[in-house]
Amino acid sequence: MEQRWGLLRKVQQWSPRPSQTIYRRVEGPQLENLEEEDREEGEELPAQFCPMELKGPERLGSCPGRSIPIPWAAAGRKAAPYLVLTTLLIFTGAFLLGYVAFRGSCQACGDSVLVVGEDVNSEDSSRGTLYWSDLQDMFLRFLGEGRMEDTIRLTSLRERVAGSARMATLVQDILDKLSRQKLDHVWTDTHYVGLQFPDPAHPNTLHWVGADGSVQEQLPLEDPEVYCPYSATGNATGKLVYAHYGRREDLQDLKAKDVELAGSLLLVRAGITSFAQKVAIAQDFGAHGVLIYPDPADFSQDPHKPGLSSDRAVYGHVHLGTGDPYTPGFPSFNQTQFPPVESSGLPNIPAQPISADVADRLLRKLTGPVAPQEWKGRLSDSPYRLGPGPGLRLVVNNHRTSTPISNIFACIEGFAEPDHYVVIGAQRDAWGPGAAKSAVGTAILLELVRTFSSMVSSGFRPRRSLLFISWDGGDFGSVGATEWLEGYLSVLHLKAVVYVSLDNSVLGDGKFHAKTSPLLVSLIENILKQVDSPNHSGQTLYDQVAFTHPSWDAEVIQPLPMDSSAYSFTAFAGVPAVEFSFMEDDRVYPFLHTKEDTYENLHKMLRGRLPAVVLAVAQLAGQLLIRLSHDHLLPLDFGRYGDVVLRHIGNLNEFSGDLKARGLTLQWVYSARGDYIRAAEKLRKEIYSSEQSDERLMRMYNVRIMRVEFYFLSQYVSPADSPFRHIFLGQGDHTLGALVEHLRMLRSDGSGAASSGLSPGLGFQESRFRRQLALLTWTLQGAANALSGDVWNIDNNF
């Protein structure tokens, strides 16, 4: 037995000691005492210990005298937890540093890195990534300046009246051009609309009328083809009154001077307001008819620039609305049944354009008080008296015809959100040559199609779909655009992201204006800093504006006018839109809507800079399309509407005392505005703290952002009765403008009631005010609730 114990002790002496601390699970504080415990339990390492610097199993056992290197393995295992912990700390620190840097760069540049090499059905990103500067370079490299000028010249030479046979030929030519591009879809959309044209057999006439009512000398209307579409037909007789621009304040000034307006024929200057607004206001004040002329004072007096001939009249429709006025609120498809109604925007009085020469003859016959100095124009022989003057008889024989019009569409599908559309369009038709009116826009549109098609061939693919549209019927009040919106409204308000209009984009080379939704103002500012000024070398468009006006948006940004196709997108469909244009420094383009709107006159007006200005517009529009179609997060400033509401509320504050005296308050409006601002700020914080690589989350945010404009369409009025439901931009009793106008009656005699649909003299009505306030408040509150997202996130303390 003693021999056995002795042998066992010898074996234990030479056998490697099993280290419990290496192989057992060590956690928490025990880890700190690991090496100390090992030293206490074990012996000193042998002198022949090999340090752990092996790179593979082939070197195991390389130490002399040891076949099983358990001692050095034990030391390696002792160091392993420290190595793991150190690696984790380094990795975590690097990850956090990279994350913060990435978030900061995204916040600073607004999604400046655009992945354009992805495929719809593949996660493979091996095709590469293009940065914003690369994408800009690609776009500018393919954009062709010379092609656009040639297209403007050739298009202006072609007759293209809406619905005409020659227009059909142009449609086919454009379709042929599009078919040669790398596009996913090309198609047309035909509507049968009611258009009004002059009757060649029975032209419109204007006669003097004697004191006994007899028809006397006929005044020449030089061009019988110049007319006002949608004017009331028949004859109107009355004494002539000069009414400046025919604005509401102009007619109120005439009433204050005891000039009789009821039963008169008003002579008004073209400009400032649309033809339709002039006629509607004249009708409100009881006039029997309207004559509209171009005064030389409204155009450039530069002798080096061409001017409008004094025997030319200006064309313009007088429907206070957009689309086919004989199917209001409904699309004009063939064989579709409609209720027998007409648009409330159709006038009940006739209107006719006349030349400056004819207006001069009329003004010289006027008596009565002399017009204010600011009302006087530049007709040399005219004293500019207010009237009344001799009697006149106006006869309008326009006739309505059912006419097919065709819109042309081309599409590049997006790879990530193909069901969201970024739309850009331009009017194609024109009453005359229409170089500035529609040839410029058509040329830019076709060049952008070609440019983006070339980019697609070079690997570019937008995240969202690009939709290019050539509109017909624009000269009759954006008929083609509005009918398309009416036909597909239930789809478009969910899918259309933004509309960009190219109409009237080059009317000069001096000032730049953007008529737009507030959602696009910040993006426009950013893009202006990327586009070179066409007439100030070394400056961007933003530099050009900011140099003279530190508050650039006050100088550049304007509300959308009703005579723009962009207006229907926003006020009717709830889609944010923009229409931008270059204009003369101090005067309007004189040839718009005349037969002198030729390529030659446009070229002379811009003194040879037409190609440069057109190129600047194309660059601006193209870069807008790139940002809107490819940024992961839509670059729409939804928070800006909070400032818009605040500005409008400022107009209401002046009446708070009057309302308080009647026991009324505007507190609900203030509360709704506060809820909207809080919802916008909350959404902004959610987006900032989110990962842009999360496609599902980004899509959820984009859906909420792109519908903000739609939230401001009143849900409490019928689209058929009030098609322009936007509470800031629309028309009707539900709008903020109508509410302010009604409040003004608290301090007036009610003379403005007619414009709000009331009989003159009724004045302020408390029941009507309460209804207006409710419609406005709940539309604002609905916008705030929708922006909040899910119902459990809504602030219900209203």
From Swiss-Prot:
Cytoplasmic compartment segments: 1-81
Comp. bias regions, Acidic residues: 33-44
Protein name: Transferrin receptor protein 2
Predominant location category: membrane
Entry-listed glycosylation sites: N235, N334, N535
Alphabetized UniProt keyword annotations: Cell membrane, Disulfide bond, Glycoprotein, Membrane, Receptor, Signal-anchor, Transmembrane, Transmembrane helix
Gene Ontology cellular component terms for the protein in this record: cytoplasmic vesicle; external side of plasma membrane; HFE-transferrin receptor complex; plasma membrane
Transmembrane segments: 82-102
InterPro entries: PA_dom_sf, PA_domain, Peptidase_M28, Peptidase_M28B, TFR-like_dimer_dom_sf, TfR1/2_PA
Location(s) in or outside the cell: Cell membrane
Subunit structure as annotated in this protein's UniProt entry: Homodimer.
Membrane protein topology class: Single-pass type II membrane protein
Pfam families attached to this UniProt entry: PA, Peptidase_M28
Similarity remark: Belongs to the peptidase M28 family. M28B subfamily.
Chain positions covered by the region annotation Disordered: 25-44
